[in-house]
Amino acid sequence: MAGRSGDSDEDLLKAVRLIKFLYQSNPPPSPEGTRQARRNRRRRWRARQRQIREIAERILGTYLGRPAEPVPLQLPPLERLNLNCSEDCRTSGTQGVGHPQISVESPTVLESGTEEQC
């Protein structure tokens, strides 16, 4: 871990050991029992795995000082999006699919049958 101090490395190793311990404390469910019992055990196991994953993200987020997930990109509403493919999209061969362009105007094909009154 180049560029880090020894204390920082030790803290990171402690965090990783803690996360490893959390995952090891939740072994996969046993395959015995009725179908319903197995299903319930798997459901509870998945819920615990989800909780462990969230705790691990919080531990690493606290250690790293930033969230694990990037900030989501703000997009316009889906009703206003459509694909507008130019001529180079229809080329065949090994050139790929081209570069589709995203238009933000509402197409007339997707509009509802009712007309809006002004």
Curated annotation (Swiss-Prot):
All disulfide bonds of the chain are none
Processing and modification events after translation: Asymmetrically arginine dimethylated at one site by host PRMT6. Methylation impairs the RNA-binding activity and export of viral RNA from the nucleus to the cytoplasm.
Print the keywords alphabetically: AIDS, Host cytoplasm, Host nucleus, Host-virus interaction, Methylation, mRNA transport, Phosphoprotein, RNA-binding, Transport
Region of interest: Disordered: 23-46, 87-118
Single GO molecular function: RNA binding
Residue ranges with Basic residues bias: 36-46
| UniProt-annotated location(s) | Host nucleus, Host nucleolus; Host cytoplasm
Q: Which GO terms describe its biological process?
A: mRNA transport; viral process
Cite the residue spans of the region called Homomultimerization.
Answer: 18-26
Q: Where is this motif: Nuclear export signal and binding to XPO1?
A: 73-84
Q: List the ranges annotated as motif Nuclear localization signal and RNA-binding (RRE).
A: 34-50
List all Polar residues biased stretches.
Answer: 103-112
**Residue numbers of Phosphoserine PTMs:** S5, S8, S92
Q: Give GO cellular component annotations, separated by semicolons.
A: host cell cytoplasm; host cell nucleolus
**Self-association or partners: how does it assemble?**
Homomultimer; when bound to the RRE. Multimeric assembly is essential for activity and may involve XPO1. Binds to human KPNB1, XPO1, TNPO1, RANBP5 and IPO7. Interacts with the viral Integrase. Interacts with human KHDRBS1. Interacts with human NAP1; this interaction decreases Rev multimerization and stimulates its activity. Interacts with human DEAD-box helicases DDX3 and DDX24; these interactions may serve for viral RNA export to the cytoplasm and packaging, respectively.
Q: Which family does it belong to?
A: Belongs to the HIV-1 REV protein family.
Q: What is known of its domains?
A: The RNA-binding motif binds to the RRE, a 240 bp stem-and-loop structure present in incompletely spliced viral pre-mRNAs. This region also contains the NLS which mediates nuclear localization via KPNB1 binding and, when the N-terminal sequence is present, nucleolar targeting. These overlapping functions prevent Rev bound to RRE from undesirable return to the nucleus. When Rev binds the RRE, the NLS becomes masked while the NES remains accessible. The leucine-rich NES mediates binding to human XPO1.
Remarks, miscellaneous: HIV-1 lineages are divided in three main groups, M (for Major), O (for Outlier), and N (for New, or Non-M, Non-O). The vast majority of strains found worldwide belong to the group M. Group O seems to be endemic to and largely confined to Cameroon and neighboring countries in West Central Africa, where these viruses represent a small minority of HIV-1 strains. The group N is represented by a limited number of isolates from Cameroonian persons. The group M is further subdivided in 9 clades or subtypes (A to D, F to H, J and K).
Extract the HAMAP family matched here: REV_HIV1
This molecule's function is given as: Escorts unspliced or incompletely spliced viral pre-mRNAs (late transcripts) out of the nucleus of infected cells. These pre-mRNAs carry a recognition sequence called Rev responsive element (RRE) located in the env gene, that is not present in fully spliced viral mRNAs (early transcripts). This function is essential since most viral proteins are translated from unspliced or partially spliced pre-mRNAs which cannot exit the nucleus by the pathway used by fully processed cellular mRNAs. Rev itself is translated from a fully spliced mRNA that readily exits the nucleus.
State the name under which the record lists this protein. Answer: Protein Rev
Q: Which organism is it from?
A: Human immunodeficiency virus type 1 group M subtype D (isolate ELI)
Q: Which gene encodes it?
A: rev
